[in-house]
Amino acid sequence: MRAFVLDGYGAIADHVRLAEIADPVPGPDDVLIEIHAASLNPIDFKLVRGDLKRVSKYQLPRPFGFDAAGIVLSAGARAIRFKPGDAVYARASRETIGTFAEKIALPQEFVALKPAAISHAEAAALPLVGLTTLQGFARVKAQAGQRILIHAGAGGIGTFAIQYARHLGLDVTTTTSSKNVDFVKSLGADRVIAYDRGNYLEQGGDYDIVYDTLGGAFTVDAFKVVKRGGVVISLSGPPDRDFARREGAGWLVRVAVWLMSRKVYAASAEAGATYCWFFTEPNGDQLREIAGLVDGGAIKPVIDREFAFEQLPAALSYLEGGRARGKVVLKVR
């Protein structure tokens, strides 16, 4: 089959190539999926750059990509939830990445029937951003009436998170560029801060939750607007100190994580708030929940642009440019 493989770390043009590789061999708990569409996420170009070498070690070359939608070709003897012909969508784990390909074999617990009312391209846009939001909100026990600040509301995660937060009954503030103000309001944002018209730090705060999708200075600055007793949950900041313990990391990695996160923890202590970082895990049950939200009209996938399969390097570069409104999708079939 054809698949894009990562053969080293660095520039996209130098290390992402289309190759002929062996078809995946599914195990007894796996489903073999013919991929019709895959979506891109920032973690993909960060992986290419080598940003994740400390926390995710891969033997290269190897296929990569996390999100996919397609048709089940076969199911293992114990993969009784699915049958050939089922239209499904899935999120691969760190160990099973490889959705920028014509086929993938995944454990059945990573897979769900795709929402019935949408296309494969729209379904492929949902898994990582949807699971990230559901798992993140569950971890901080988000509930109706709380005030949440969602950074980058027009991005892939932001467009899903705004809709899901509104579904739960949270009071939603988001940041975006002035050209996207009406767009994020249409998704359900109560208040919008246009970052090209003013500094969000000067717009007040006292948020119960800050959902940090940007990292860098935004992670530390989040503690200037979160309320005492609140929580900053980050997808892009440094790993929290529990991460190394959860991963069973050695002392060298634990020291590295401590050094990476020291500024964040200092800001957290000063603000009297909690810092939470996590890596999303595949979850077919939650994908079924998301499918119900989509079919019920609570969530609508947002696609900025679709690229042909052979254009993955261009699609990664486009996403890395930071101007996508919603998700970038790869049409495999």
How would you describe each model-predicted region?
Residues 22-39, 52-97:
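Glycine-rich beta-strand-centered segment in the early N-terminal region that forms part
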Residues 77-78, 172-183, 216-218, 240-241:
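Short glycine/proline-centered loop/turn elements that form peptide/ligand docking sites
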Residues 81, 90-152:
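NAD(P)H dinucleotide-binding glycine-rich loop of Rossmann-like/cofactor-binding domains
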Residues 89, 210-211, 233:
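N-terminal Rossmann-like NAD(P) cofactor-binding module of classical short-chain dehydrogenase/reductase
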Residues 126-197:
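Mid-domain Rossmann-like dinucleotide-binding core that forms the NAD(H)/NADP(H) cofactor-binding site
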Residues 202-209:
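A short acidic, Gly/Pro-enriched loop at the edge of an enzyme's catalytic core
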Residues 218-296, 332:
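Glycine-rich phosphate-binding loop and adjacent beta-alpha segment
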Residues 279-333:
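C-terminal hydrophobic helical "lid"/dimerization subdomain
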